Amino acid sequence: MTGSMLDIRGLTVDYVTGRGRHTAVNDVSLAVGPGRVTALVGESGSGKSTLGQAVLGLLPNAARVASGSIRLGDLELLGLPERRLRTLRGARIGLVPQDPTGSLNPVRTVGASIAETFRVHGDRDHAKIRRRVLELLERVGIDDPATRARQFPHELSGGMKQRVLIASAIALEPDLIVADEPTSALDVTVQKTVLDLIDSLGRESGTGVLLITHDLAVAADRADEVVVLRGGAVQETGRASEVLAHPTAEYTRTLLADAPSLSSVVERRIPDAETARPLIEVQGLRREYARRGAEPFVAVDDVSFTVAAGTTHALVGESGSGKTTTGRAVAGFQRPTAGTVSVDGIDVTALSGRGLRDYRRVVQLVYQNPLASLDPRQRVGRAIEEPLRNFGLGGAAARAERVQHQLEQVALDPALASRYPAELSGGQRQRVAIARALVLDPRVLVLDEAVSALDVTVQAQILRLLARLQEELGLTYLFISHDLAVVRQIADTVSVLRRGRQVETGPVERVFSAPESDDTRQLLAAIPGTAYNDETAHEAGTEATR
């Protein structure tokens, strides 16, 4: 095959609503060659997902293609009737979506989900379909395909579910795969495995890949060409190695400067973790869950660490490593099976009733998804005020004044108090969640993947906010994350967990530069972004801040 598999020229897409016309994609051109990966990089609202929807013929009703061309080989896609587009989806264009849990039917086995791809395209040979399903599951690296084909999505890990979606996407050997944030919800080791799979499938079969991502490190590792979008317009395009090593657009330099790096640390004036008194002490923590007819499942097994007052301790590991269970035990939401948790001299494991309720004023949780943790029917101001009402603190006027103070403290306009969560951006919602957590003046924040769902620029802003709040308020953080580059920037000490056990703990500098455990080394090796070095990113950051 020669030429471009996908050729987009001068594409403009508008959204027409009651409020008027909004241009989501503005005069965008790009190409994807056979066996090549083109990465479409940008923040939320950059237009990258709208462009992907346009390629698939899945634009929402409010969207209008104002101008341009989308060609798949020699076929012009724009203007094709829906019936024709349906035959192309799956057969010539495959989709790997972001959320495997939301994309798979929970009441259908994974084998049936893959088989549906064949049936939709007219294949009725059940024996042949079953053989192909098992072949596909084996091809994407799923062990024991016959057993897995009979399982339901909830019985598979996130990485396995994403492999099932890839199997569906390649079932009919399409010319093009649109991979829309295919690994943003996955841990680094699973992410590497899934990206390796997409990469190898493309190279083996000559399939082109349009990789939609906000992760520059993923683009650096996997793409042949990069297109950087902002506000629907192309800021920069070219070979990935050139764009990321020598960016010409100011916006690209800003993205590179904001990307977390394993070799750089954000300087923070905080107490020395070695000499400051321990505020959090966890000793021999164990948490079991009973299982009918089987041995208990051990989620956390003999985890111990201390966190000095005013410092940040990170819990790092893959899904199922026990890091969230450990964090919830510190926050008082999980009672350990064995071991002790002490915070500011309080034995958390002995608390119940009123004592446990009062403990909520000492430790607060900040979750990964603020949209899920904030009541969508409750205005922002009311959400921040709610903990004060629950504890009977202050009158209405004093609470309103405190809400204004909290919004200002997290660098939000107090006028946002009258908005609903859905009316805010992801970064604004996370700031609201932090403001709500701080309204009771806690000593400790447990931050559970608090920045993992955010674009790189917004993520950098939230990390800077957390560093400032720690310095101003003397806060102690327990920072739960699967992103080691982020941990490198914010944490003083770290515990690496695997399958419930602590495999390594110590100062971040030592653990990351001279890891003692093979598990830690594997986590570090799986981090994307080795295609361009941190020195280049530093140079880009220097240029961006001049």
Name these PLM-found stretches.
Residues 173, 441:
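Conserved catalytic motifs of ABC-family nucleotide-binding domains
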